């Protein structure tokens, strides 16, 4: 049963310690303590499994909270657990600036813990730097460099030693160009002398996701263009592209090596920067030079969209002939053009061809759903069902599949076919357990999962086991990540990850975990979520196997800022999982993100709304980019929208997005008591999708973290990754 219960909350902790004589050391537990992130241990025999461990179960605790238990484990006889405990104790002592004690704990640890030998040497050097003994500190850094010269950890020694001997910095850049310390060196050297194309290109290649890279690129292009070779221009172009500087990217792609992707992005960059005539010319060059490349099909579609109807139809016909993966989309576009030309019979023939020959395409699914909705609007529910039922059967991976299957059940209810409706809802829950419509189906089946009228009052129990194991990376990286030593794991991964343009499934999943560990949640969630888009058969099979694991889904639905969310959810009597679900949709847990409309932070609070709330609660100073302030103000407003609509969460969440006045207008306008029909009737496409996304997020947090609901869903679905019962309740 889902129950109301009270929580005991623990504030997160974040420490950043600067060691004397060495660069800033970010406490490795910072993100996982400050943000309350929990990436959980999956079940089943697969690459994500982590054996039970007393040490790993303590990773989520602060140094003071875990010290006693780690000491007890460290006193045991020689074992892996003992070595792990000693390593964490030493790391915690360094954070607490107790160098002498850390040195003692680290003594001879390499003998029992060889996979972290290089990092033990690093910890020893960091510990000595706290003692004030310059001679031994220097010796420790030299020892690290000599004994582990081929390890990426050597970059840390090269960074420190290079402060007095500049050749070490050049050695770091040469040996470990992608290591964070090498990038730090490049930035420092560019401050001294900005005109160094080699270093600017280094940052463009390995640090392009930082927004401050754009001025670096601008300087490089304006001052050193004559020195750049085509491959350099490709590096610059990609960095501009990733930062959405499409016009600048187009200029750079024009000078890059001629490949289908580069030429396509050249044309697309021109189009996005409103240079349509030039874009058309480049698209035509692409199609002529690479007639069978996938990008040529994309270019033909772009040309069709910006051309006059008859010319557009010729482009679409070429797509149908040469690019079967894009044929469905091309046929729909052609049919729409024929409709506009008043050639209704020809349009009908094209749509029939779509269904007959390309019935498994996304375009066919979307067309079927369009017709099904039209039939349902006329209350012809039998015809609507006939059109919709092919979608989950032939397009099971399409986003419309669970929606169509759900509405088949709703229409069956209207026809008085209650058994058929029950079968349809069970089908949705069985085949699409991750969908918003699975939650709605579970509700209509009478399962105890909450609904729009009760979800606010529920305080679900949820369980937070230990972190998942990365699929890719060295044994050292996996061990560091399990131990919560995030800064060291991330630095190591930045060197080991050599194929970011074409990563394997395992590499992309691991990269997503590292972004989550850095607190860059939008990128991390996106990397993990878009694994489902793989279409190469082998990679698709790898994703299907991964998606059966609980750890994959829990990484996709993480818990940043959990302590703050719990605190303010309790303050305003809100379901903490619903608050988390809303934040995931609003900001992907990015505290400084801003919308084009001006909304700010985790819960995307508008400045004017924030001022109104602050006056109501007598808060004189606040910062919407501060998670504490943003969640305090956002949950107040979430409470307000719930109170305005009598705790009916459907309307409260819709009004959070569209404003309560619009929701009140819709209530008067739409004559329905059916919540599902109301959602479908919302005239704002953004708000309609927003409602489904927020409650879909809520459902996923519930089914992935609540043991009771997880077991309930598992009774219906064999693709739902159920939880085991050996997890600790939050």
How would you label these PLM feature ranges?
Residues 621-629:
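A short, structured beta-strand-centered segment in the mid-to-C-terminal lobe
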Residues 2-101, 105-107, 111-112, 116-119, ...:
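Cell-wall glycan-active module
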């Amino acid at each position: 049963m889902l129950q109301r219960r009270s929580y005991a909350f623990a504030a997160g902790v974040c420490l950043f310690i600067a060691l004397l004589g060495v660069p800033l050391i970010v406490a490795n537990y910072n993100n996982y303590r400050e943000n309350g992130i929990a990436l959980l241990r999956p079940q089943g025999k697969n690459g994500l499994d982590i054996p039970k461990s007393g040490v790993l179960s303590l990773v989520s605790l602060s140094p003071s909270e875990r010290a006693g238990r780690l000491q007890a484990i460290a006193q045991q006889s020689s074992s892996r657990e003992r070595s792990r405990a000693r390593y964490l104790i030493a790391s915690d002592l360094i954070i607490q600036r107790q160098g002498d004690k850390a040195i003692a704990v680290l003594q001879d640890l390499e003998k029992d813990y060889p996979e972290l030998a290089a990092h033990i040497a690093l910890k020893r050097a960091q510990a000595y730097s706290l003692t004030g003994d310059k001679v031994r500190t220097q010796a420790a850094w030299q020892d690290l460099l000599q004994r582990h010269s081929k390890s990426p950890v050597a970059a840390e020694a090269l960074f420190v030693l290079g402060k007095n001997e500049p050749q070490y910095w050049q050695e770091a850049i040469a040996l470990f160009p992608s290591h964070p310390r090498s990038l730090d060196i490049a930035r420092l050297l560019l401050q001294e002398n900005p005109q160094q194309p080699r270093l600017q290109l280094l940052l463009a290649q390995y640090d392009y996701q930082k927004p401050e890279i754009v001025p670096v690129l601008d300087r490089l292009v304006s001052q050193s263009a004559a020195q750049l070779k085509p491959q350099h221009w490709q590096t610059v172009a990609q960095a501009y592209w990733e930062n959405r500087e499409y016009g600048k990217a187009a200029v750079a792609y024009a000078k890059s090596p001629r490949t289908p992707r580069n030429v396509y992005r050249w044309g697309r960059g021109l189009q996005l920067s409103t240079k349509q005539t030039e874009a058309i010319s480049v698209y035509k060059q692409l199609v002529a030079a690479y007639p069978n490349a996938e990008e040529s099909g994309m270019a033909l579609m772009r040309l069709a969209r910006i051309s006059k109807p008859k010319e557009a139809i010729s482009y679409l016909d070429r797509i149908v002939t040469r690019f079967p993966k894009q044929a469905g989309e091309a046929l729909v576009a052609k049919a729409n053009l024929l409709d506009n030309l008043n050639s209704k019979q020809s349009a009908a023939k094209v749509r029939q061809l779509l269904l007959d020959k390309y019935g498994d395409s996304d375009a066919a699914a979307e067309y079927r759903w369009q017709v099904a909705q039209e039939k349902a609007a006329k209350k012809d529910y039998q015809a609507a069902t006939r059109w919709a039922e092919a979608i989950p059967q032939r397009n099971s991976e399409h986003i419309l599949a669970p929606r169509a299957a759900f509405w088949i059940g709703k229409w069956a209810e209207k026809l008085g076919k209650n058994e058929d409706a029950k079968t349809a809802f069970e089908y949705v829950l069985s085949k699409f357990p991750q969908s918003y419509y699975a939650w709605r189906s579970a509700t209509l089946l009478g399962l105890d999962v909450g609904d729009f009228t009760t979800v606010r009052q529920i305080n679900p129990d949820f369980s937070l086991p230990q972190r998942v194991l990365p699929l890719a990376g060295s044994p050292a990286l996996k061990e560091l990540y399990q131990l919560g030593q995030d800064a060291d794991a991330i630095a190591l991964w930045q060197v080991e990850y050599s194929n970011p343009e074409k990563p394997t499934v395992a590499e992309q999943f691991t990269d997503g975990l590292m972004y989550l560990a850095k607190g860059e949640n939008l990128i991390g969630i996106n990397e993990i979520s878009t694994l489902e888009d793989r279409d190469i058969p082998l990679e698709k099979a790898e994703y299907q196997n991964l998606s059966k694991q609980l750890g994959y889904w829990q990484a996709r639905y993480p818990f940043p800022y959990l302590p703050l969310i719990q605190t303010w959810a309790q303050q305003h009597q809100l379901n903490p999982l619903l608050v988390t679900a809303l934040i995931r949709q609003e900001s992907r847990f990015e505290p400084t993100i801003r919308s084009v409309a001006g909304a700010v932070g985790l819960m995307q609070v508008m400045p004017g709304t924030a001022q109104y709330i602050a006056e109501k609660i007598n808060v004189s100073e606040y910062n919407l980019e501060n998670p504490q302030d943003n969640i305090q103000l956002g949950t107040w407003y979430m409470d307000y929208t719930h109170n305005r609509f009598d705790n009916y969460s459907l309307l409260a969440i819709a009004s959070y997005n569209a404003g309560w006045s619009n929701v009140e207008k819709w209530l008067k306008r739409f004559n329905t008591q059916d919540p599902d029909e109301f959602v479908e009737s919302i005239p704002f496409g953004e708000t309609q999708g927003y409602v489904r996304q927020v409650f879909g997020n809520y459902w996923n947090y519930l089914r992935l973290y609540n043991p009771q609901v997880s077991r309930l869903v598992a009774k219906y679905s064999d693709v739902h990754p159920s939880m085991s019962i050996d997890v600790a309740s939050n």
